[in-house]
Amino acid sequence: MGGVSRIVAVLAWRNLWRNYRRTLIMLLAIGIGVWAMIFMSALMRGMTDQMVHNGLAVLPGEVQIHHPRYRSDPSVVNSMPSPTGELLAALEKPPVSAWAARVRVPAVIASERDSRGVTLLGVDPAAERALGSLPDEILQGRFLTDAADRGVVLGASLARKLDTELGKRVVIMSQDPDNNVADRGSRVVGIYRARLASNEEQFVYAGREVLQQMLTIGTAVSEVAVSANDYRQVDSWAPAIEDAAGDNLEVLTWMELDTFLSSMLSMQDGFTLI
């Protein structure tokens, strides 16, 4: 059998180079096809990765912690305590690179001309900056200086619809834990630009401590967002956060929070494997 195999190999080799132009054209076509597949796979992987990163900037974070009923009813009644003890220790331990606790509640914002329903975000700018979840661009003015900043930052689209501008005062209204209206006047200190106009219209930024005081919730927060700068490895470190959080809090990865992005990533991985 070994001799037959050698004879077949010699005949095949001679046949290939009997018409060397044909063979070179075939090899060139195969090479171009292989490199085209590699290029397309890399391009699609890059597009998928960018889509996931953009999605995590909106969520944000690879893991989020909430009160178990918060996602179905995002009111201050379903707030959670600020991280302490074991949970705080887990958040400060590698591979976690950044985390931020924020107040996130539905609200109404009113100017002299109009009013709109929005999502009010009470943030600590330093923590959000480390998490990479600040607005893409500040068009006018500035962002909040700290968690006690008494100004608000609006999206450009929202500012146009409210017919307000930098330096003007607006009123923000929401509900406290007793279902009473909680409101305060704030000055617009910044106007931001986001990738999507819908985000500009939805999110209004304020100081976390200012909102906690307005809503009379003490140091409670709506959610904690956590990042380790590697969304593909989230399953390796998320269980430690879940164990530290205990049974009274809900800990979800980005794949559970955004099933569309997770499906896109799985499809891309399958395409690359094939």
Language-model regions, residue ranges each:
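Cytochrome P450 core scaffold surrounding the K-helix E-X-X-R motif
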Residues: 127-135
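Hydrophobic, regular-secondary-structure patches
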Residues: 35-119, 142-148, 243, 247
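Loop-to-transmembrane-helix entry motif
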Residues: 19-23, 54, 264-274
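N-terminal Sec/SRP start-transfer signal
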Residues: 1-38, 57
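Hydrophobic secondary-structure segments that place a key small or acidic residue at a functional site
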Residues: 102-103, 114-123, 137-209
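Hydrophobic side chains in well-ordered alpha-helices
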Residues: 51, 87, 130, 236-237
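Mechanotransmission and gating elements of multispan inner-membrane complexes involved in transport
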Residues: 176-272
